[in-house]
UniProtKB/Swiss-Prot annotation:
The lineage of its organism: Bacteria, Pseudomonadati, Pseudomonadota, Alphaproteobacteria, Hyphomicrobiales. L-aspartate binds at residues 131, 135-136. Pathway: Amino-acid biosynthesis; L-arginine biosynthesis; L-arginine from L-ornithine and carbamoyl phosphate: step 2/3. This is Argininosuccinate synthase. It comes from the Bacteria. It comes from Rhodopseudomonas palustris (strain TIE-1). Belongs to the argininosuccinate synthase family. Type 2 subfamily. PROSITE patterns: ARGININOSUCCIN_SYN_1, ARGININOSUCCIN_SYN_2.
Amino acid sequence: MTTILKSLPKGENVGIAFSGGLDTSAALLWMKQKGAKVFAYTANLGQPDEADYDAIPRKAMEFGAEKARLVDCRTQLVHEGIAAIQAGAFHVSTGGIAYFNTTPLGRAVTGTMLVSAMKEDGVNIWGDGSTYKGNDIERFYRYGLLTNPALRIYKPWLDQQFIDELGGRAEMSAFMTSHGFAYKMSAEKAYSTDSNLLGATHEAKDLEHLDSGIKIVNPIMGVPFWRDDCAVKAEAVTVRFEEGQPVALNGQTFTDPVAMFYEANAIGGRHGLGMSDQIENRIIEAKSRGIYEAPGMALLHIAYERLVTGIHNEDTIEQYRINGMKLGRLLYQGRWFDSQALMLRETAQRWVARAVTGEVTLELRRGNDYSILNTVSPNLTYAPERLSMEKVEDAPFTPADRIGQLTMRNLDITDTRAKLGLYAKTGLLSSGEGTPIPQLENDKG
């Protein structure tokens, strides 16, 4: 039996992820009038552009919902965001600046917590506003069915009758007005925005064109640092971790991780930290482009990685990065709770994050311009005396030790030279001036 419904299931309980915007408002009213029993669920994800969460369920009831619930998802969202930082679960980057997977993290939390709330109310049909071209339709599908295997999916935007009757925002606005709801369309922006406490995504419309960029975006979590009239003062900030958990900012200890994240966003946002312009591959392998904000995630990530590099050895750091790239892609694909993702995540949290205790002091300037001023940890394996250019007592190794170590390298150098000669003989490589490798003499003995 298919889990996707192509038409409205009249007379049945249907849950809708309700934002209070024009699209979901029109969809709720339309489904009600067509005979469905509509239940509205709103996720409080700490969206920085949402002024009054409590008003959203009231609005849903006015439009005919049988029941409307506001589900506070912020604590779980921050929990997942910190887990992503601990595991370095970020696979999309440009020039070393990462996209912090804030939308995929939000979908993992929304998709599980809203469907759990629906299940409590006896609602086993779920609708949301994701379109067939995007990532969210698959993310919500996976998380919804993981949470409730009896779930069926109904999306008004995949229902041809809904599309024929309310195919655009102008039609939706007219529909709401004709039924006594003076719903005016908001002014059209040059792009669309989706946000949560961890970050904001700006995409589509004008941002689909690569000759439009960050300068057309009005940040909602930070400042337009690229503008000459935007005053940004340098600021020192200290971040403290205990066993991989961020616990203090500028000496202020937080017992509530949500409050800590609000403060991290405020600090990073004052500088525009964490904004990036990325071209990425969607789940369906088509490329899309987005402008991202994540001031708090960026601040914590920078401090965390500084401690990681000062505490762990090279092989551990290498594996952390490899696993993080893989885990980031799984997260992006809506597989954050799949077994392979849990394995990678648990590995990082247990063997990398647990050792990360200490403080990092940064100087934030404009955008992603910052300096690291100090790093302190009881677990640092960085020991400057090991490599000091000055004479030190009880040196860990001597010139004679290094001579012996270099002599041992002759074994693999000889093997490598022989291989290069073999490749040159077979035509795989050319040697000599102007080629990738210099003229090498054959090993004569």
